[in-house]
């Protein structure tokens, strides 16, 4: 079984005080809830995609405890980067740390397309839908960042498409941290690529707190699903072979 959950926002290291509990009651005891709920549904042979905002650490060494926490949970994990993952490093450095720390169940979803059971896993971080978004950092080149994410998305989808030729019975899924569509705003360059590669399901995180918002919607034949941890009650959501 494949599962997905974004925005773990872990802060397990001693002296790291970046708990999400200040953001409301739903986050109260969230790391304990995550461990309990994850362990209740995920088996060791399952896979879990984690599309970003994984740890509050500011460097790869600082993220060590959070990575060990994830590694201790059941299942094989596929992690991609979020906007708060300042600890994220190069793939080679991260793999070196995994080997040095005997972290055995974490894989990267980063310019690649892992194959898991019925699915080819693709995606990228994404970016804000519009350069006028209220929360977008100042002084950044919106078009340059979107173009960079488009390149990374194509790298992943090209590898996925090659895998589909060898495994035509599989479905290619897209995972983002940022929503390509949200609250009337659209990141058209990335949406166009999803259509070009015939993606039917796209999962995203990043959104918090607006619990009245729809967590799943269809736009031009693609189903978009919000899978931030607080929307899932900190329990990984299953992805079934049929569309859901």
Each model region followed by its residue ranges:
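Conserved catalytic scaffold of divalent metal-dependent phosphoesterases
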Residues: 8-13, 90-185, 243
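Extreme N-terminal starter segment of soluble prokaryotic enzymes
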Residues: 1-3
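Core catalytic region of metal-dependent phosphoesterases/phosphodiesterases
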Residues: 16-116, 186-197, 221-222, 226-228
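Residues at the C-termini of beta-strands that transition into short coil/loop
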Residues: 6, 81, 112, 125, ...
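Active-site glycine-centered loops adjacent to acidic/histidine catalytic or metal-binding residues
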Residues: 7, 52-53, 82-83, 177, ...
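Short N-terminal binding/cap micro-motifs at the start of the first secondary-structure element
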Residues: 11-16, 234
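Conserved beta-sheet core of the metallophosphoesterase superfamily
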Residues: 78, 180-244
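Short active-site segment of divalent metal-dependent hydrolases/proteases
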Residues: 10, 55-56, 180, 209
């Amino acid at each position: 079984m494949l599962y997905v959950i974004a925005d773990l926002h872990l802060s397990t290291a001693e002296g790291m005080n970046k708990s999400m509990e200040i953001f409301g009651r739903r986050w109260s005891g969230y790391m304990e809830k995550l461990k309990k709920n994850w362990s209740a549904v995920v088996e060791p042979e399952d896979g879990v995609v984690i599309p970003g905002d994984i740890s509050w650490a500011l460097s790869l060494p600082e993220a060590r405890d959070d990575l060990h926490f994830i590694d201790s949970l059941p299942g094989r994990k596929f992690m991609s980067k979020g906007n708060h993952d300042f600890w994220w490093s190069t793939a080679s450095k991260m793999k070196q740390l995994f080997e040095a720390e005997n972290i055995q169940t974490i894989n990267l979803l980063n310019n690649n397309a892992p194959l898991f059971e019925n699915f080819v896993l693709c995606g990228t971080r994404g970016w804000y839908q519009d350069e006028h978004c209220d929360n977008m950092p100042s002084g950044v080149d919106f078009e340059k960042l979107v173009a960079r994410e488009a390149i990374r998305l194509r790298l992943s989808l090209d590898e996925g498409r090659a895998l589909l030729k060898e495994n035509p019975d599989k479905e290619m899924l897209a995972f983002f941290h940022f929503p390509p569509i949200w609250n009337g705003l659209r990141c058209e360059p990335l949406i166009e690529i999803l259509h070009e590669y015939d993606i039917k399901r796209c999962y995203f995180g990043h959104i918090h707190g607006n619990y009245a918002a729809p967590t799943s919607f269809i736009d031009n034949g693609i189903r978009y699903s919000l899978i931030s941890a607080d929307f899932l009650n900190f329990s990984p959501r299953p992805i079934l072979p049929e569309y859901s």
